[in-house]
Regions:
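Catalytic loop of the DD-peptidase/beta-lactamase superfamily, centered on the K-T-G motif
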Residues: 1-120
Length: 120
């Protein structure tokens, strides 16, 4: 999973091998929904986000707890969560296997800790 995330941060390349085109990475990691569509994209984990071809994309960091514009990723039904932050060149991954889980609260706390550790 880490190699997949790094490949996306590298614009579709893993080492010297091209896995996805730059265009494909841009399609899945940049917002493509309209402001009107975004009004229905209002789950707790998606406040401030739009949606790309496959992933949520942070478009309004002022209304979420922490993150950089352009952060993208996805989460799963059993509580797994992944995001890439191209601005800071970092990946955040959280893996659990609990249907329903604890929701977004522990993720927000962990992301706040991660971002507070970054040097300006």
């Amino acid at each position: 999973y880490e190699k997949f995330a790094q490949m996306l941060l590298n614009g579709g390349k893993c080492g010297d091998a091209r896995i996805l085109s730059r265009k494909a990475v841009d399609l899945i990691s940049h917002n493509i929904i309209t402001a009107e569509q975004a009004k229905t994209f209002n789950w707790d984990s998606c406040i401030g986000y739009g949606y790309g071809g496959l992933m949520r994309t942070l478009i309004n960091p002022e209304i979420t707890t922490v993150g950089s514009t352009g952060e993208y990723g996805w989460d799963g039904w059993t509580g797994n969560y992944f995001c890439n932050d191209p601005e800071n060149n970092l990946t955040f991954m959280y893996f659990i296997q609990v249907c329903g889980g604890n929701g977004i609260r522990p993720l927000r706390t962990l992301k706040q800790v991660m971002y507070s550790a970054l040097d300006d």
